[in-house]
Amino acid sequence: MSAGWRLRGNSRLRVIVGLALIATVTYASYQAGRFSGTTVITAPDEAWASNDASSQAFDNLLTSLSFAASEAYSASQTGETGLSSDKSYEYLLELLAASIEMQLSKGDPSAPEFTDWMSGYRKFLGDSPDARYLTAPIDSAYDYELTFDMGDADYLGVVIYDTNPLTGWNRASDSLYFLAENPPRENLIRLASRDTSTQTNDQPSGYELQLSKTAHTVMVRTYRFNAAVEDNSRIAISVDQTRPREPVDDALSVERRLANTTRFFNETWRGSRALARATASTANAFDQPAEVSPDFVGIFYPTPDNSYHGGAFDLAPHEHLVINGKAPDSAFWSVTLQNHWMQSLEPSIGQASLRGDEITVRDGRYRIWIGALPPPEGENWLSTGGLQQGLVAIRYLLATSEEAPTARVISTKHSMDEAIR
């Protein structure tokens, strides 16, 4: 072999060895990172947060999440939820995200901001595909101004919530609404405590809602009567600077807002579970539960212009729950299926929500079949997508005439034929 070939051969060998070393180091680095990335972090000493109030509040929030996950896991194992534990974990994390935004990031009533409850991926407390819910924290120590534009929304309603002194539950203390067919003459709503609203006759233009001493939340709801129309409504809230008042707190501390985050998270998931358990006792019948847990208080946000009906379903694969009712005289109505945690079912499983204008009505009455399999031809159908257990939410908006619908289980083709005669 010539010297030239030996030189080139040695060069190739050096290149091969170098590449092998690079590959070895890269693989070792990957494995080290993979190992460290999957290593479980050791739990801290239980006393780590004992000497600091904010740390205690932070630890309480994490403890609440862990406890809720353990309860959700147990409920999934017993079949109580009809869902896998993974689905319940997704719900809890969605609720946590909303709780943090609502009570921590935007939880200061001296500088309020609206939280869009069902923004993006989040679903909780009986969401509806046709509605939008926004809330902001308020305090009677301040006056507020709401500026809004209904956009293409067909309905916009505002509710002030305070605390019922007898029960401790949320109470709708004042409210108003607008319909697109009779639009507002002004785009300003003032929120004022009773003493400031009567101090002067020099009132600015717009509408006014009164704040009681225990007022804590303002909720704005918008509805689209046509699902093809996107909700482009806009609303903002600010402290009324023309009426300076002595504030209770210039800003809520992180400790306080963390505590409020934990409270809202706990009350909401426990309240949702309480409702599901209560209605499960009368599944497939729409009867009033004989008993409701005090935990139900966590989801009680009454709306003066909505009436609600429905209950739970618990169906075998070959069964249907058939709802019979009188079509209400209302501005809007809908029937929506939800899971154990009051989350509307995904459209990907099939039609799981119907507006009144989508429901076939015969002689002033409607009939809706709920189940995994299609009903007889020409009948209204809501698909469970194979979900055995869940909730049926029927809402009538601004109803002037209504009656409570009924429900019964149909289990065979013969019975199906009998039901439609």
Please report, for each region that a protein language model flagged, where it lies by residue.
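A compositional/structural signature for long, glycine/proline-rich flexible linkers
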Residues: 28-421
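N-terminal Sec-pathway targeting helices
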Residues: 2-21, 28
